[in-house]
Amino acid sequence: FRSHEMGMVDDAIAALQAAARSPRQRFDAASMLGRIYLERKDTTRAIEWLERAAEAPAPTPDAGRALLYDLATTLESIGEQARALAVFVELESESGGYRDVAGQIERLSKVQARG
C-alpha cells in the first residue's frame, strides 16, 4: 500500500511540475509542490518551489501571505535567518499584523545583531 501511495505522489509531482509551467497555474502548482517536499523533509526543493510560487501572482491575498509565511519559516528551519528575516519584512510591509510576523521580525533581528 505504501509504495502505491508513493507512486501516486510521484505522479502528482510530475503533473504539478507540468502545471507550474503555465503562468495561470504557477502559484497553486508551485505552492503545492513546496508543501509536498516539506512533508517529504526535502527542504531544499521545498524552498525552491515556494520561491517560484512567491514570484507568481497569488489568487488571493491570504494565499500569498500564507505562502510567504511558510517560506520564511522553512528558511529559518535550515539556518537561513537573514533570508527568513527578509521574507518576514516583506510580508509585514504588505500586510501588517499578519499572524506573529512582527514578533518573528523582532526575534530574527536580534539573532542577526548578535551575528
Regions found by a protein language model. Give the residues of each.
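Start-of-helix register in tetratricopeptide repeats
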Residues: D28, D62-A66, D100
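"A position-specific structural signal for the A-helix of alpha-solenoid helical repeats
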Residues: M32, Y69-D70, Q104
